[in-house]
Design a protein with these regions (language model features):
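Noncatalytic alpha-helical scaffolds and linker/capping helices
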Residues: 129-133, 137-164
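Active-site C-terminal subdomain of aminotransferase-like
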Residues: 1-96, 105-107
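Generic recognition of stable, solvent-exposed alpha-helical segments in well-folded globular domains
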Residues: 6, 58-62, 77-84, 88, ...
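Generic, well-ordered alpha-helical scaffold segments in large soluble proteins
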Residues: 6, 10, 18, 62-70, ...
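Short beta-strand
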Residues: 103-108, 137-141, 223
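Conserved PLP-binding catalytic core of the aspartate aminotransferase-like
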Residues: 83, 96-130, 149-152
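Flexible inter-domain linker/hinge segments
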Residues: 155-225, 229-237, 242-245
């Protein structure tokens, strides 16, 4: 899961990783630059935290590019669909009648429904039956099971899950229902930056990703930009001696 955090300028030396700041280039245009990088953290080790591996940024990039590709309307559509699955499933549970009375634990939820099965025996039975056919549910406690829906959920999943809990396969309603309290709904604009409203086809997305890649400095385009401090900002010809036997 990607994580994002903010901090004041005063606290920046306590933050791990590389910090990117907004500056201006030689022509006065807005530009991004390293405001605090590994080397500075190394030199000022008494005032800054040691650098922490930033490989986790891949997850943040994936989450960011997901938002770029789908845009605000796409993200809303996906979220509404997921919530509709959860709402419809909860309604089936609420309307279930039988010897074992099921109930939905929470009135408000987004994608996850916690079902109280009324007894440990029934909860164990449902949980094991689901596991046997490849559904990974969460045993909330002795009598409760948590069911989470996602973008990958489909109508067949809905039929199987309702069959597991109420012994009757239900169809997903044609109309989506939103049961969130109005106080939890955002009314302001989201993802309003142009980048989230420009690349919504595969070729547009690939071209955008390629343009970002081309901004990076590489050996075949310029000098060596990253690596050991002894190798930074050296032209290729200056690096040749490291290959000499002597």
């Amino acid at each position: 899961h990607a994580a994002y955090f903010a901090f004041s300028d005063k606290a920046k030396r306590s933050a791990p990783g590389r910090i990117i700041g907004v500056s201006k280039d030689s022509q006065g245009n807005t530009a991004l630059r390293m405001a605090l990088q590994t080397r500075e953290q190394h030199i000022r080790r008494e005032k800054a935290n040691s650098n922490i591996c930033t490989s986790q940024v891949l997850l943040a990039n994936l989450a960011g590019m997901y938002a770029v590709y789908h845009g605000p309307s796409g993200v809303k559509r996906i979220a509404t669909r997921i919530h509709a699955f959860a709402t419809a499933f909860a309604e089936v549970i609420r309307q279930a009648n039988g010897e074992n009375k099921l109930s939905v634990v929470h009135d408000q939820f987004f994608d996850t429904v916690v079902v109280d099965c009324g007894s440990e025996k029934l909860a164990t039975q449902i949980f094991e039956n689901a596991d046997n056919i490849g559904y990974n549910l969460w045993r909330f406690d002795d009598t409760k099971i948590s069911v989470a829906f996602s973008e990958t959920s489909d109508e067949e999943d809905f039929k199987v899950l309702t069959q597991l809990f109420v012994n009757t396969s239900h169809q997903l309603p044609e109309t989506a229902s939103v049961s969130l309290d109005q106080t939890h709904l955002r009314n302001d604009d989201i993802l309003s930056h142009p980048v989230f409203n420009s690349h919504h086809t595969e070729h547009e997305m690939l071209r955008y990703l390629k343009s970002l890649e081309d901004r990076d400095l590489a050996m075949n385009r310029s000098m060596i930009a990253l690596g050991s401090c002894t190798m930074k900002l050296n032209a290729t010809s200056e690096m040749l001696p490291i290959t000499w036997p002597e």
